[in-house]
C-alpha cells in the first residue's frame, strides 16, 4: 500500500476505498473514489488532486455551534455554478408546499386506502403527491407528507431540494438513489434521508415503487435524547449507513430540477452533476434499516407514550416540542399485566400522519392497509376501533409477540392541512369515523 506524505501533514493511503457504506450517524466521514483524491490536511488547496474543484456544501450557518455545525467538502469534476442560463419555472404536478390553503375541508379524522400504482411511465418528480402540509416553507419550519408513485427511472434528469431534507419510506419496490455523495439502495423496511441541497436522481430497482416521503422544512433529523433509557436501545448510531464516493464523468446533457420557495425550477446542465470524486464532512445522505430499531416498553403494566418509538427527530426552538418526530411501531413483545395493551384513546397537541409499510396495525386491524395513510390532526380524538377495543379488553393477558408489522408516524407541532388532491382522492375513506361508532356505553354505577 502506497502512502503519500507532505511536510507537516499526516500520510494517507492512496488505495481507493472499497465501494459500499460507512457506518455511523453524524460522523465526520471521508471517502474517495480515486486514490489520493482527498487533499491532506487542508480543504481548499491551490490545485486539488486530479484537476478537481473544491466546493463546500453547508447545511448550517458558518457560526452554528460545533455540535450542530454541518458541512461537507466536495471535490468534483465541475463546480455546481456551471449550469446553462437561468432557472425557469417547471410544472410541479401534485407537489405542494406550506402554507397551502387550497382546500377548506372540515376538520375530521381522515384515512386513505393505498393509491394505485401508475399505469403510464412516471418518474419520481412526476409521481410525488402531497397529502398534507404544515408550517411555512419560507420560514424553514414544518413539513409536508407526500406519497410517491413511480413507474420509470429518471434518465438525464437530476434534482435537489432547497426547501428541506427528504425522508424516503418505501412501501413497495426498491429505489436506487444516485446522489453526488454516492449511491444508496433502499427497500421496504428501510428509510433514506437526502439532506437539503444534495443533488440526486431516483432509479427503480425491481419494478414500480410506492412509498411515503417526508419533506422536512426545519432543522435536520437527528437522534433523539435517550434520557433515563441510557446509552443503548432505540436507533443506534452504528446502524446508519452513509455511501462511499462514486462519480460519473459524463458529458451527456441533463436537466437539473430544483425545489425552491415552494416552486419547482429547471435549468440545463451540459454534464452529469454526479461528479464528486471525493468528499469529507458530516453533511451527507444516509440510510437506516428500521428492523434494527431496538424498542423499549412496559415490562410491568400500562402502555407508555409513543415517543419511546422515536427513530429520528427534527427539533424546534422549544425543547421537547418537535418540528417533526419520525416514529415507528415495529415488531415487539407485549407483556404488560392488567393493562389495555393497544394505544389508548387520545387527544394530542401534536398532529399525526401515519402510514403502514406492511402487516396489521394493532389499534386498527381493519381498514388501515399497507400503503394507506391516516391523519389525526391536533386536538382531534382518536384511538382503537371497536374490534381492537373489544379484543384487547377481553384477551388473555399472556405474553404476545406482535409480529410481521411495521407502521410509522410523521408527528409535528403544526396543524397539517389537507391538499385538494388528498381531500378529493378516490382513496379517501368516507366512512372512517364509523370505526368508532360501534363503541358501546359500558358505564354501570353499580359495578365498580
UniProtKB/Swiss-Prot annotation:
Organism domain of life: Bacteria
Active site: 303
Protein name from the UniProt record: Homogentisate 1,2-dioxygenase
Binding, homogentisate: 361, 382
UniProt: Fe cation binding residues: 346, 352, 382
Keyword tags: Dioxygenase, Iron, Metal-binding, Oxidoreductase, Phenylalanine catabolism, Tyrosine catabolism
Family as reported in the entry's similarity comment: Belongs to the homogentisate dioxygenase family.
First-level EC class: oxidoreductase
Catalyses which reaction(s): homogentisate + O2 = 4-maleylacetoacetate + H(+)
Pathway annotation from the record: Amino-acid degradation; L-phenylalanine degradation; acetoacetate and fumarate from L-phenylalanine: step 4/6
Gene3D superfamilies: Jelly Rolls
